[in-house]
Curated annotation (Swiss-Prot):
Disulfide bonds listed in the record: none
PANTHER family to which the protein is assigned, alphabetical: ABC TRANSPORTER I FAMILY MEMBER 17
Matching Gene3D superfamilies: P-loop containing nucleotide triphosphate hydrolases (3.40.50.300)
PROSITE patterns according to UniProt: ABC_TRANSPORTER_1, ABC_TRANSPORTER_2, PSTB
Binding site for ATP: G51, P52, S53, G54, C55, G56, K57, S58
Catalytic activity: phosphate(out) + ATP + H2O = ADP + 2 phosphate(in) + H(+)
Record-given protein name: Phosphate import ATP-binding protein PstB
Keyword vocabulary terms for this entry: ATP-binding, Cell inner membrane, Cell membrane, Membrane, Nucleotide-binding, Phosphate transport, Translocase, Transport
Matches recorded under SMART domains: AAA (SM00382)
GO terms for MF: ATP binding; ATP hydrolysis activity; ATPase-coupled phosphate ion transmembrane transporter activity
Length: 273
């Protein structure tokens, strides 16, 4: 199946919800990395995943467009619904999932191609037949990097600074017209000025896309997100590892100013993490 549209499913699902995680447990071999996650990610908002290292937040993020399929031994129980359709259903094409739900990684990773082709290449292989020049410009503008790139579109993407490369990667993701954009610590390798540009870009992008971001920077979560999910991890009984779990999911203002769980209060106040 190469489409995620199933009329019988989309009739009943909540259109305000972009992604619905229902009792999701993700394992690597016999090790449960994160378990029993229930979460509804709202459409047209920025949702932040926060928590200490090893709590499973990036694992959950990558499950939202099946990037974890590329990791040997990784498996998922439960369901993730997108438009009322289970992304892990037996007839779902993972490539189509990744077109509809794009991802931007921690380290900028432009293609070894020109700036122009970084945008055009993915659109072309996904069947885009419109005005490519217009698409390239529109995508670069949406990612707030057009002014830096417009006079050197034929130069290598590697000629850009780190922050510009990351915005180029965002533009590349936008070009294939996804509905959701996942961002896995997109600013962790960037300087403060580049980070600010990415954050400003996110505020504009949420007018057109649903965004889910993993960040270790709690101030960033406060600045950019509408909703925040706090993950934590606990030691496995009788084992040596830790299993991640979702502690609390709420409006960002409530998570940081009036959390319902003591563990959330301890984390956002800097008592651990």
């Amino acid at each position: 199946m190469t489409t995620l549209q199933q009329p019988q499913a989309t009739e009943s699902h909540n259109t305000d919800v972009a992604l619905s995680l229902q009792n999701v447990t993700i394992s690597y071999g016999n090790f449960e990395a994160v378990k029993n996650v229930y979460c509804e990610i709202p459409r047209g908002k920025v949702t932040a995943f926060i928590g200490p290292s090893g709590c499973g937040k990036s694992t959950v993020l990558r499950s939202l467009n099946r990037m974890n399929d590329l990791i040997e031994g990784c498996s998922l129980k439960g369901s993730i619904l997108f438009g009322g359709v289970d992304l892990y259903g037996p007839k779902i094409d993972p490539v189509e999932v990744r077109r509809r739900i794009g991802i931007v990684f921690q380290q900028p990773n432009p293609f070894p191609k020109s700036i122009y082709e970084n945008i055009a290449f993915g659109a072309r292989i996904n069947g885009y037949t419109g005005d490519m020049d217009e698409l390239v410009e529109r995508s670069l503008r949406q990612a707030a990097v057009w002014d830096e790139c417009k006079d050197k579109l034929n130069e290598s993407g590697y000629s850009l600074s780190g922050g510009q490369q990351q915005r180029l990667c965002i533009a590349r993701t936008i070009a294939i017209q996804p509905e959701v954009i996942l961002m896995d610590e997109p600013c962790s390798a960037l300087d403060p000025i580049s980070t600010l540009k990415i954050e400003e870009t996110m505020h504009e992008l949420k007018k057109s896309f649903t965004i889910v971001i993993v960040t270790h920077n709690m101030q960033q979560a406060v600045r950019v997100s509408d909703m925040t999910a706090f993950y934590n991890a606990e030691a496995v009984e009788g084992g040596t590892g830790k299993v991640g779990y979702l502690v609390e999911f709420n409006d960002t203002d409530k998570i940081f100013n009036a959390p319902q769980q003591q563990a959330t209060q301890d984390y956002v106040s800097g008592r651990f993490g």
